[in-house]
Amino acid sequence: MSVAGGVSKAVERAVVHGCEALQIFTKNANQWRGKPLDHAEIELFRQRIEQTGITPVVSHASYLINLATTFPALREQSIAAFIDEIDRAEALGLLGVVIHPGTCTAGPDDEALRLIADAIRVAFKARPRVKTMVLLEHTAGQGRTLGHRFEHLAAIITHLRGSRRVGICLDTCHLVASGYDITTEAGYRDTFERFDRLVGIDRLKAFHGNDSKRPCGSRVDRHEHIGHGCIGLEPFQRLLHDARFAGLPILIETEKTDRAQRPDAIVEDPLDRMNLDVLRSLQ
């Protein structure tokens, strides 16, 4: 949900749409750092979350961060920005920060996965007492991005000695794009059995609910409105009726209209409403 006009505005927009959970950016996703969160705005956000009962709330980290990079300056900048994301989320009382693991810039994937874990370890040491979790997002697998195999996520967690400060966010579009065919009953069953075996269902803290413009195995990340893409409605219905995922949020990241992005706009976005209504009809 847009934070135009201040983070507390995202809660108002969520209420307009009848949301039960929420994902926000705490700053511009295409900038390294944002201006510090105003204390009054933090308190207003927390009050509105408590009043509305919207939970959980997570943030999404900047797209610029690359915890897998081998370039020293970019690595230092990425880790600093990552810690800033954690600080902002902690100040707002969020469950976690969703982050793409990273993109390999040189060498084998195994070494890049170790670099990701090392960067997370640095952040944990810098902020030893924060409650906000790091939620690794499973990716579509474009280029040399990491995290598109469950084995990648498992390796990062293993390098971190199984830290319980690490959770997972699964994106339905990314699952299909990376080759996990959840569109069939058998494929859905096999995918989550494999995830449980390699990573653990207990690590799963949130879903991104997006259809896919591209077919299974394309390794191209293109979100589509729910029911309008290559995934279809049945997999979402399975998710909503799967007892293992009861209580987990499904956060949509589909295209919005321009009018909902204005700082003064606390209005219903017809595209968000359409996708939410589709999901609710499947419950």
Question: How would you name each of these model-derived features?
Answer:
Residues 34, 71-75, 106-110, 181, ...:
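Glycine-rich tight-turn/loop motif centered on a GG-T
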Residues 14, 60, 78, 89, ...:
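Conserved, mostly hydrophobic/aromatic
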Residues 154-283:
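Histidine-acidic metal/acid-base catalytic patches
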Residues 67-167, 271:
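Active-site acidic/histidine proton-transfer and metal-coordination neighborhood
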Residues 37-43, 79-82, 113-117, 149-153, ...:
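Charged helix-capping and loop-helix junction motifs
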Residues 2-4, 27-29, 61-64, 102-104, ...:
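Active-site beta-loop-alpha junctions enriched in small/polar residues
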Residues 12-19, 37-58, 85-93, 121-131, ...:
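Acidic (Asp/Glu)-rich catalytic clusters
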Residues 1-61, 65-86:
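N-terminal pre-domain/capping segments
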